[in-house]
Amino acid sequence: RMKVCQFMALLEQMRIEEWEYDHDTAYGRVDCVGIYRYTMYWYYSASSVKALKISTHVEGTYRNSVYNKTDPKKNVVGKGKIDANTEFRIGMGLFRNPFGDDGHFAVYVGNYFPGYENAVIESVYGGVIIRELSESEAINDPFTHYGYMKGIDYTN
């Protein structure tokens, strides 16, 4: 599986190259959950993504983040509702309002990148950006759920 440090490097490349926000996922253009989906295709071959059963469907990724039972055939392999006891880990997916029209996904990066303490990387209308979690939540409401994403090794 892809190490978290490799996942972070691919996300950082998107930010450095100033990828744009777009519902059509392609090189240089991704929507919010597209930052995860595109890194899976980038790291693994298309046939490997299929063999790993990594879904390319946005709604499926959102919905699996909030169901009581984790579906191992979906992208989120471990998850929960965010509360005061949630321990954020670098590379963890964060979900906001997964069932609403304004649902959103970001990746928690914490202090992985210099100059940030408690940050997320996300694709928003301004493109792929890193900003403090508190700033993202102040603009768009708090994230409600977290999940460990399929294809990523969180042990490193």
Where is each model-derived feature located?
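...with weaker cross-activation on analogous glycine-rich loops/strands in unrelated enzymes
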Residues: A46-E135, D141
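Non-catalytic ligand/cofactor/substrate-binding and regulatory segments of enzyme domains
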Residues: R1-Y21, E122-N156
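Intrinsically disordered, low-complexity N-terminal regions enriched in serine/proline/glycine
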Residues: E20, I35-W42, T61, V66, ...
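N-terminal capping segments
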Residues: R1-T61
